[in-house]
Protein backbone atom coordinates (compact mmCIF):
# COMPACT_ATOMS: atom_id res chain seq x y z
CA UNK A 1 0.00 0.00 0.00
CA UNK A 2 2.83 2.41 0.84
CA UNK A 3 4.44 1.73 -2.54
CA UNK A 4 1.11 2.34 -4.26
CA UNK A 5 0.74 5.73 -2.56
CA UNK A 6 4.28 6.69 -3.58
CA UNK A 7 3.47 5.67 -7.13
CA UNK A 8 0.35 7.85 -6.91
CA UNK A 9 2.45 10.93 -6.18
CA UNK A 10 4.71 10.04 -9.08
CA UNK A 11 1.69 9.66 -11.36
CA UNK A 12 0.56 13.23 -10.60
CA UNK A 13 3.78 14.66 -12.03
CA UNK A 14 3.48 12.42 -15.10
CA UNK A 15 -0.24 13.07 -15.53
CA UNK A 16 0.35 16.82 -15.49
CA UNK A 17 2.08 16.34 -18.86
CA UNK A 18 0.35 13.33 -20.37
CA UNK A 19 -3.18 14.54 -19.67
CA UNK A 20 -3.00 18.04 -21.24
CA UNK A 21 -0.93 16.88 -24.24
CA UNK A 22 -3.93 14.86 -25.38
CA UNK A 23 -6.11 17.89 -25.98
CA UNK A 24 -3.81 19.73 -28.40
CA UNK A 25 -5.07 17.74 -31.39
CA UNK A 26 -8.65 17.74 -30.11
CA UNK A 27 -8.74 21.51 -30.07
CA UNK A 28 -7.15 21.73 -33.49
CA UNK A 29 -10.02 19.58 -34.77
CA UNK A 30 -12.53 21.73 -32.91
CA UNK A 31 -11.10 24.92 -34.42
CA UNK A 32 -11.22 23.47 -37.92
CA UNK A 33 -14.78 22.20 -37.64
CA UNK A 34 -16.24 25.09 -35.64
CA UNK A 35 -14.30 28.27 -36.36
CA UNK A 36 -13.52 27.62 -40.04
CA UNK A 37 -16.62 25.75 -41.20
CA UNK A 38 -18.44 28.81 -42.52
CA UNK A 39 -15.28 30.09 -44.18
CA UNK A 40 -14.85 26.70 -45.88
CA UNK A 41 -18.47 26.70 -47.06
CA UNK A 42 -18.50 30.30 -48.29
CA UNK A 43 -15.21 30.03 -50.16
CA UNK A 44 -15.62 26.59 -51.76
CA UNK A 45 -19.25 25.55 -52.14
CA UNK A 46 -21.02 28.44 -53.91
CA UNK A 47 -24.34 27.69 -52.22
CA UNK A 48 -27.59 29.50 -52.96
CA UNK A 49 -29.43 31.53 -50.31
CA UNK A 50 -31.80 28.61 -49.73
CA UNK A 51 -28.95 26.16 -49.30
CA UNK A 52 -27.16 28.48 -46.86
CA UNK A 53 -30.41 28.77 -44.89
CA UNK A 54 -30.60 24.96 -44.79
CA UNK A 55 -27.02 24.74 -43.51
CA UNK A 56 -27.83 27.32 -40.83
CA UNK A 57 -30.88 25.31 -39.80
CA UNK A 58 -28.76 22.16 -39.55
CA UNK A 59 -26.28 23.93 -37.27
CA UNK A 60 -29.06 25.21 -35.00
CA UNK A 61 -30.71 21.80 -34.92
CA UNK A 62 -27.42 20.15 -33.98
CA UNK A 63 -26.96 22.57 -31.07
CA UNK A 64 -30.45 21.73 -29.78
CA UNK A 65 -29.64 18.04 -30.23
CA UNK A 66 -26.50 18.53 -28.12
CA UNK A 67 -28.65 19.60 -25.18
CA UNK A 68 -30.04 16.06 -25.06
CA UNK A 69 -27.02 14.21 -26.43
CA UNK A 70 -24.50 15.49 -23.88
CA UNK A 71 -26.23 14.31 -20.67
CA UNK A 72 -27.15 10.97 -22.22
CA UNK A 73 -23.54 10.39 -23.28
CA UNK A 74 -22.42 11.42 -19.80
CA UNK A 75 -24.59 8.72 -18.24
CA UNK A 76 -23.39 6.12 -20.76
CA UNK A 77 -19.76 6.92 -19.97
CA UNK A 78 -20.45 6.86 -16.23
CA UNK A 79 -21.96 3.38 -16.50
CA UNK A 80 -19.13 2.00 -18.65
CA UNK A 81 -17.03 -0.71 -17.01
CA UNK A 82 -13.96 -2.07 -18.80
CA UNK A 83 -10.46 -3.19 -17.86
CA UNK A 84 -9.24 0.18 -19.20
CA UNK A 85 -11.68 2.19 -17.09
CA UNK A 86 -14.71 4.15 -18.26
CA UNK A 87 -13.01 7.15 -19.88
CA UNK A 88 -10.23 5.87 -22.12
CA UNK A 89 -12.37 3.56 -24.31
CA UNK A 90 -14.65 6.47 -25.20
CA UNK A 91 -11.65 8.72 -25.77
CA UNK A 92 -10.32 6.27 -28.35
CA UNK A 93 -13.68 5.51 -30.00
CA UNK A 94 -14.72 9.15 -30.11
CA UNK A 95 -11.44 10.35 -31.58
CA UNK A 96 -11.32 7.71 -34.31
CA UNK A 97 -14.93 8.38 -35.35
CA UNK A 98 -14.43 12.16 -35.27
CA UNK A 99 -11.42 11.82 -37.55
CA UNK A 100 -13.60 9.96 -40.05
CA UNK A 101 -16.28 12.65 -39.87
CA UNK A 102 -13.82 15.52 -40.37
CA UNK A 103 -12.01 13.96 -43.32
CA UNK A 104 -15.33 13.12 -45.00
CA UNK A 105 -16.68 16.64 -44.50
CA UNK A 106 -13.66 18.48 -45.89
CA UNK A 107 -12.31 16.00 -48.44
CA UNK A 108 -15.44 14.80 -50.28
CA UNK A 109 -15.88 17.23 -53.18
CA UNK A 110 -19.63 17.80 -53.61
CA UNK A 111 -21.64 20.99 -54.01
CA UNK A 112 -25.24 22.18 -53.99
CA UNK A 113 -27.91 20.14 -52.24
CA UNK A 114 -25.67 17.08 -52.30
CA UNK A 115 -23.28 18.95 -50.01
CA UNK A 116 -26.15 20.11 -47.79
CA UNK A 117 -27.22 16.49 -47.34
CA UNK A 118 -23.68 15.32 -46.62
CA UNK A 119 -23.13 18.26 -44.28
CA UNK A 120 -26.30 17.48 -42.34
CA UNK A 121 -25.27 13.87 -41.77
CA UNK A 122 -21.69 14.77 -40.86
CA UNK A 123 -22.62 17.69 -38.59
CA UNK A 124 -24.95 15.58 -36.46
CA UNK A 125 -22.41 12.75 -36.49
CA UNK A 126 -19.77 15.21 -35.28
CA UNK A 127 -22.05 16.26 -32.41
CA UNK A 128 -22.16 12.64 -31.27
CA UNK A 129 -18.55 11.62 -31.85
CA UNK A 130 -16.95 14.79 -30.46
CA UNK A 131 -19.14 14.53 -27.36
CA UNK A 132 -17.83 11.00 -26.80
CA UNK A 133 -14.25 12.09 -26.31
CA UNK A 134 -14.94 15.59 -24.97
CA UNK A 135 -17.02 14.43 -22.00
CA UNK A 136 -14.69 11.52 -21.30
CA UNK A 137 -11.64 13.82 -21.49
CA UNK A 138 -12.86 16.50 -19.09
CA UNK A 139 -14.69 13.95 -16.95
CA UNK A 140 -11.38 12.24 -16.28
CA UNK A 141 -10.11 15.09 -14.05
CA UNK A 142 -12.07 14.06 -10.91
CA UNK A 143 -10.70 10.53 -11.40
CA UNK A 144 -7.14 11.84 -11.35
CA UNK A 145 -7.43 13.55 -7.96
CA UNK A 146 -10.08 14.48 -5.40
CA UNK A 147 -7.96 17.41 -4.19
CA UNK A 148 -9.34 20.77 -5.48
CA UNK A 149 -5.83 22.23 -5.75
CA UNK A 150 -4.59 19.33 -7.85
CA UNK A 151 -7.71 19.52 -10.03
CA UNK A 152 -7.01 23.21 -10.60
CA UNK A 153 -3.55 22.28 -11.88
CA UNK A 154 -4.95 19.69 -14.27
CA UNK A 155 -7.69 22.04 -15.50
CA UNK A 156 -5.49 25.10 -16.00
CA UNK A 157 -2.78 23.15 -17.77
CA UNK A 158 -5.31 21.36 -19.98
CA UNK A 159 -6.86 24.69 -20.96
CA UNK A 160 -3.36 26.05 -21.65
CA UNK A 161 -2.55 23.15 -23.98
CA UNK A 162 -6.00 23.48 -25.55
CA UNK A 163 -5.08 27.10 -26.25
CA UNK A 164 -1.86 25.92 -27.88
CA UNK A 165 -3.86 23.65 -30.17
CA UNK A 166 -6.33 26.42 -30.97
CA UNK A 167 -3.51 28.88 -31.65
CA UNK A 168 -1.70 26.49 -33.97
CA UNK A 169 -4.90 25.80 -35.86
CA UNK A 170 -5.86 29.46 -36.03
CA UNK A 171 -2.43 30.34 -37.36
CA UNK A 172 -1.90 27.52 -39.85
CA UNK A 173 -5.36 26.83 -41.29
CA UNK A 174 -5.81 30.23 -43.03
CA UNK A 175 -2.23 30.18 -44.35
CA UNK A 176 -2.58 26.66 -45.79
CA UNK A 177 -6.07 27.01 -47.28
CA UNK A 178 -6.37 30.51 -48.76
CA UNK A 179 -4.22 32.51 -51.16
CA UNK A 180 -0.79 31.60 -52.49
CA UNK A 181 -0.05 29.27 -49.58
CA UNK A 182 -3.04 26.98 -50.17
CA UNK A 183 -1.92 23.34 -50.30
CA UNK A 184 -2.52 21.91 -53.75
CA UNK A 185 -3.08 25.36 -55.23
CA UNK A 186 -6.75 25.74 -54.26
CA UNK A 187 -8.90 26.30 -51.20
CA UNK A 188 -10.67 22.97 -51.81
CA UNK A 189 -7.48 20.92 -51.77
CA UNK A 190 -6.07 23.07 -48.96
CA UNK A 191 -8.91 22.23 -46.60
CA UNK A 192 -8.83 18.55 -47.57
CA UNK A 193 -5.12 18.20 -46.77
CA UNK A 194 -5.41 20.28 -43.60
CA UNK A 195 -8.25 18.02 -42.42
CA UNK A 196 -6.07 14.94 -42.98
CA UNK A 197 -3.06 16.51 -41.28
CA UNK A 198 -4.97 17.67 -38.21
CA UNK A 199 -6.69 14.29 -37.96
CA UNK A 200 -3.37 12.45 -37.89
CA UNK A 201 -1.95 14.86 -35.29
CA UNK A 202 -5.03 14.53 -33.10
CA UNK A 203 -4.68 10.74 -32.99
CA UNK A 204 -0.99 11.04 -32.09
CA UNK A 205 -1.63 13.54 -29.28
CA UNK A 206 -4.55 11.63 -27.74
CA UNK A 207 -2.25 8.61 -27.36
CA UNK A 208 -0.37 10.53 -24.66
CA UNK A 209 -3.56 10.63 -22.59
CA UNK A 210 -4.77 7.13 -23.37
CA UNK A 211 -1.47 5.35 -22.77
CA UNK A 212 0.32 7.80 -20.47
CA UNK A 213 -2.28 8.86 -17.89
CA UNK A 214 -2.78 6.88 -14.70
CA UNK A 215 -6.10 7.38 -12.93
CA UNK A 216 -5.10 7.68 -9.27
CA UNK A 217 -6.98 9.57 -6.58
CA UNK A 218 -4.22 10.11 -4.06
CA UNK A 219 -6.38 11.32 -1.22
CA UNK A 220 -8.81 8.42 -1.46
CA UNK A 221 -5.92 5.95 -1.57
CA UNK A 222 -4.41 7.51 1.55
CA UNK A 223 -7.72 7.45 3.40
CA UNK A 224 -8.32 3.81 2.52
CA UNK A 225 -4.80 2.79 3.50
CA UNK A 226 -5.09 4.33 6.96
CA UNK A 227 -8.62 3.19 7.74
CA UNK A 228 -8.49 -0.37 6.41
CA UNK A 229 -5.60 -2.48 7.65
CA UNK A 230 -7.18 -5.89 7.20
CA UNK A 231 -8.40 -6.69 3.69
CA UNK A 232 -10.96 -9.12 5.10
CA UNK A 233 -12.57 -6.23 6.98
CA UNK A 234 -13.05 -4.17 3.83
CA UNK A 235 -16.66 -4.10 2.71
CA UNK A 236 -17.77 -3.45 -0.87
CA UNK A 237 -19.07 0.04 -1.42
CA UNK A 238 -22.48 0.25 -3.02
CA UNK A 239 -22.33 2.59 -5.98
CA UNK A 240 -25.22 4.86 -6.87
CA UNK A 241 -27.18 3.82 -9.92
CA UNK A 242 -27.05 7.11 -11.81
CA UNK A 243 -29.60 7.75 -14.52
CA UNK A 244 -30.95 10.64 -16.57
CA UNK A 245 -33.80 11.42 -14.15
CA UNK A 246 -31.52 11.36 -11.13
CA UNK A 247 -28.95 13.51 -12.90
CA UNK A 248 -31.60 16.12 -13.78
CA UNK A 249 -32.79 16.19 -10.16
CA UNK A 250 -29.24 16.60 -8.88
CA UNK A 251 -28.58 19.47 -11.30
CA UNK A 252 -31.91 21.14 -10.45
CA UNK A 253 -31.05 21.11 -6.73
CA UNK A 254 -27.48 22.33 -7.28
CA UNK A 255 -28.03 26.10 -7.55
CA UNK A 256 -24.32 27.00 -7.94
CA UNK A 257 -24.11 24.58 -10.86
CA UNK A 258 -27.27 26.00 -12.45
CA UNK A 259 -25.87 29.54 -12.41
CA UNK A 260 -22.59 28.31 -13.85
CA UNK A 261 -24.48 26.51 -16.64
CA UNK A 262 -26.35 29.73 -17.55
CA UNK A 263 -23.12 31.76 -17.50
CA UNK A 264 -21.37 29.07 -19.55
CA UNK A 265 -24.17 29.15 -22.14
CA UNK A 266 -23.98 32.93 -22.57
CA UNK A 267 -20.18 32.87 -22.68
CA UNK A 268 -20.13 30.20 -25.37
CA UNK A 269 -22.72 32.04 -27.49
CA UNK A 270 -20.65 35.21 -27.39
CA UNK A 271 -17.41 33.40 -28.08
CA UNK A 272 -18.95 31.47 -30.94
CA UNK A 273 -20.33 34.60 -32.59
CA UNK A 274 -17.00 36.41 -32.51
CA UNK A 275 -14.50 33.66 -33.31
CA UNK A 276 -16.54 31.08 -35.22
CA UNK A 277 -18.88 33.34 -37.17
CA UNK A 278 -18.50 37.09 -37.42
CA UNK A 279 -14.77 37.19 -36.68
CA UNK A 280 -13.30 35.11 -39.47
CA UNK A 281 -15.88 36.17 -42.07
CA UNK A 282 -15.41 39.87 -41.28
CA UNK A 283 -11.62 39.66 -41.52
CA UNK A 284 -11.76 37.95 -44.92
CA UNK A 285 -14.27 40.34 -46.47
CA UNK A 286 -12.98 43.56 -44.89
CA UNK A 287 -9.22 43.04 -45.21
CA UNK A 288 -8.98 40.71 -48.19
CA UNK A 289 -8.76 36.97 -48.76
CA UNK A 290 -5.20 36.73 -47.52
CA UNK A 291 -4.85 33.86 -45.08
CA UNK A 292 -2.04 35.69 -43.31
CA UNK A 293 -4.37 38.42 -42.05
CA UNK A 294 -6.62 36.06 -40.16
CA UNK A 295 -3.61 34.08 -38.95
CA UNK A 296 -2.20 37.25 -37.36
CA UNK A 297 -5.59 38.19 -35.94
CA UNK A 298 -6.24 34.84 -34.28
CA UNK A 299 -2.66 34.04 -33.23
CA UNK A 300 -2.05 37.33 -31.43
CA UNK A 301 -5.47 37.17 -29.81
CA UNK A 302 -5.14 33.62 -28.55
CA UNK A 303 -1.47 33.90 -27.57
CA UNK A 304 -2.34 36.51 -24.93
CA UNK A 305 -4.48 33.96 -23.11
CA UNK A 306 -1.49 31.65 -22.67
CA UNK A 307 -0.08 34.09 -20.12
CA UNK A 308 -3.25 33.78 -18.05
CA UNK A 309 -3.22 29.98 -18.26
CA UNK A 310 0.38 29.79 -17.06
CA UNK A 311 -0.19 32.22 -14.19
CA UNK A 312 -3.67 31.01 -13.20
CA UNK A 313 -2.60 28.67 -10.35
CA UNK A 314 -0.72 31.58 -8.73
CA UNK A 315 -3.51 34.09 -9.40
CA UNK A 316 -6.20 31.79 -8.00
CA UNK A 317 -4.31 31.51 -4.71
CA UNK A 318 -4.15 35.29 -4.29
CA UNK A 319 -7.28 36.67 -5.97
CA UNK A 320 -10.78 35.56 -4.88
CA UNK A 321 -12.65 33.81 -7.67
CA UNK A 322 -15.53 36.32 -7.70
CA UNK A 323 -13.15 39.28 -7.95
CA UNK A 324 -11.19 37.54 -10.70
CA UNK A 325 -14.40 36.94 -12.68
CA UNK A 326 -15.28 40.63 -12.36
CA UNK A 327 -11.85 41.72 -13.61
CA UNK A 328 -11.99 39.30 -16.54
CA UNK A 329 -15.51 40.48 -17.44
CA UNK A 330 -14.39 44.13 -17.52
CA UNK A 331 -11.35 43.29 -19.67
CA UNK A 332 -13.53 41.33 -22.09
CA UNK A 333 -16.11 44.14 -22.37
CA UNK A 334 -13.39 46.70 -23.08
CA UNK A 335 -12.09 44.44 -25.86
CA UNK A 336 -15.56 44.10 -27.40
CA UNK A 337 -16.06 47.88 -27.23
CA UNK A 338 -12.80 48.44 -29.13
CA UNK A 339 -13.83 45.89 -31.77
CA UNK A 340 -17.21 47.58 -32.11
CA UNK A 341 -15.61 50.99 -32.66
CA UNK A 342 -13.52 49.56 -35.50
CA UNK A 343 -16.68 48.84 -37.49
CA UNK A 344 -17.29 52.60 -37.75
CA UNK A 345 -14.17 52.79 -39.99
CA UNK A 346 -12.77 56.07 -38.65
CA UNK A 347 -9.17 54.85 -39.02
CA UNK A 348 -7.01 53.94 -42.04
CA UNK A 349 -7.56 50.30 -42.95
CA UNK A 350 -4.09 49.07 -41.94
CA UNK A 351 -4.26 50.80 -38.53
CA UNK A 352 -7.85 49.66 -38.04
CA UNK A 353 -6.78 46.03 -38.45
CA UNK A 354 -4.26 46.27 -35.61
CA UNK A 355 -6.70 48.11 -33.34
CA UNK A 356 -9.27 45.39 -34.07
CA UNK A 357 -6.68 42.74 -33.23
CA UNK A 358 -5.88 44.51 -29.94
CA UNK A 359 -9.57 44.51 -29.08
CA UNK A 360 -9.82 40.82 -29.90
CA UNK A 361 -6.80 40.15 -27.69
CA UNK A 362 -8.48 41.80 -24.70
CA UNK A 363 -11.86 40.16 -25.34
CA UNK A 364 -10.26 36.76 -25.81
CA UNK A 365 -8.24 37.20 -22.62
CA UNK A 366 -11.44 37.87 -20.70
CA UNK A 367 -13.43 35.14 -22.48
CA UNK A 368 -10.97 32.33 -21.92
CA UNK A 369 -10.23 33.46 -18.39
CA UNK A 370 -13.94 33.23 -17.58
CA UNK A 371 -14.08 29.86 -19.36
CA UNK A 372 -11.25 28.54 -17.19
CA UNK A 373 -12.80 29.80 -13.94
CA UNK A 374 -16.19 28.29 -14.82
CA UNK A 375 -14.66 24.98 -15.88
CA UNK A 376 -12.92 24.65 -12.52
CA UNK A 377 -16.07 25.79 -10.70
CA UNK A 378 -18.11 23.06 -12.39
CA UNK A 379 -15.61 20.42 -11.31
CA UNK A 380 -15.81 21.70 -7.73
CA UNK A 381 -19.62 21.85 -7.60
CA UNK A 382 -20.23 18.29 -8.84
Regions found by a protein language model. Give the residues of each.
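Membrane-embedded alpha-helical bundles of multi-pass transporters/translocases
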Residues: 1-382
Amino acid sequence: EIQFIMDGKKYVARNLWMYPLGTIGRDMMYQLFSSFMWTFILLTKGLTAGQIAAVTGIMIGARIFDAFNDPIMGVIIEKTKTRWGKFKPWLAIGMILTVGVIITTFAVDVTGWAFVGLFGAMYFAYSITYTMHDISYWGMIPALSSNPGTRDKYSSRAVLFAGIGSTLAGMLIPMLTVGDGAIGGSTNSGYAWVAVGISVLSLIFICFTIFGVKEVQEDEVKDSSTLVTNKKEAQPVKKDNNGIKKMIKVIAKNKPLLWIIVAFLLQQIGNGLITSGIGSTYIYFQYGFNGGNYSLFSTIGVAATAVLMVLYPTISRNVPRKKLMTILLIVGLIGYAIMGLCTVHFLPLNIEFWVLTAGFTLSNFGQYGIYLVMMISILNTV
